[in-house]
A protein has these predicted regions:
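Internal intein/HINT superfamily modules and their associated LAGLIDADG
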Residues: 5-300
Length: 300
């Protein structure tokens, strides 16, 4: 352009190249981006910038993927946790409260379990229609104890799922600030949420002979455990219990809720597991065995 400064000439040159790129490559850009190619890769191949490719995609109604979406190589129902309106969603929200984590920076939801309980990760995968792999990580100690240190892990990349979980109280670094999500979980679904939490952070202890005994232990903040007891009492009446501070020397609010009276424990566990459609297989088996133990003692 005669008589103009270099910056102006460069500006008009870019506009002209943009028009030429649109005229020649728009359909190719849309197809290749839809097929999974990045804007930078497409731009390099046609002599354009990734920014121009993004602009063309947006101009034609296309959705520019987030970093989390690019990381995600597997199908996923991102809005599974948007509204907690089914037993399955309430259960897995509780399980995430216990054993899951969210990372807003990496836009990642992570759930890990000891390898024997890896079936829980497969159940969550199925629930949220995910094709992400469950990976097994082993810490080798050079002896027969190696298998005891195997961990199964499921990572789901989704900014929407992270945001939904945070909106329901499943926040980063939640250990010392967990509270019951009354606003998110409707009353009829609250026992399923508690069962999910119990399957993650509760236990049915074994007796001296290695058999499940009718008792239950739940770990959490004192405030959260009080709220669990309040929900339980409104459904089946007061439950006899005791509290034990887990590590008093650490000066924090992590507490153990003990339901040690056998009949009370079975009543609590029956409320959690009766007619349940989603649960940890190992915990369900222990509940059945402990209930049978009490039944045999009452009716030999």
């Amino acid at each position: 352009m005669i008589g103009c400064c270099p910056a102006t000439a460069n500006f008009y040159g870019r506009k002209q190249r943009g028009r030429e790129t649109r005229a020649k490559y728009t359909q190719e850009i849309l197809k290749r981006y839809s097929d999974g190619e990045s804007t930078d890769a497409i731009g390099r191949s046609i002599g354009a910038t990734g920014g121009l490719v993004k602009t063309i995609v947006r101009e034609n109604g296309g959705h520019i993927k987030t970093i989390a979406e690019w990381k995600r190589k597997h199908a996923l129902n991102e809005r599974f946790f948007q509204t907690i309106d089914t037993e399955e969603k309430a259960y897995f929200l509780g399980f995430m409260y216990a054993d899951g984590s969210v990372n807003p920076v990496k836009k990642t939801v992570c759930l890990s379990q000891a390898e024997p309980d890896a079936d829980m990760l497969l159940k969550l995968k199925a629930a949220c229609s995910s094709a992400a792999p469950v990976r097994i990580y082993r810490r080798s100690h050079g002896d027969a104890s190696e298998n005891r240190h195997a961990t199964a892990m499921l990572n789901l990349h989704s900014s929407s799922m992270v945001e939904d979980l945070i909106s329901h109280g499943c926040v980063p670094n939640k250990t010392f600030k967990t509270r019951f999500p009354f606003d998110s979980v409707p009353t009829p679904l609250r026992r399923h949420f508690i069962r999910g939490y119990f399957d993650g952070d509760g236990s049915i202890p074994l007796g001296a002979r290695g058999k499940p005994m009718p008792s239950a232990v739940v770990v959490g903040t004192k405030e959260f455990l009080d709220e669990i007891l309040m929900v339980t009492a409104s459904a089946i009446g007061e439950i006899k219990h005791t509290f034990h501070v887990r590590h008093p020397e650490r000066n924090h609010n992590i507490t153990q809720l003990h339901i040690s009276t056998q009949s009370e424990a079975v009543r609590f566990l029956w409320w959690l597991y009766n007619d349940a459609s989603v649960f940890m297989d190992r915990k369900m088996s222990r509940y059945i065995a402990s209930a049978q133990y009490l039944k045999n003692r009452i009716m030999p």
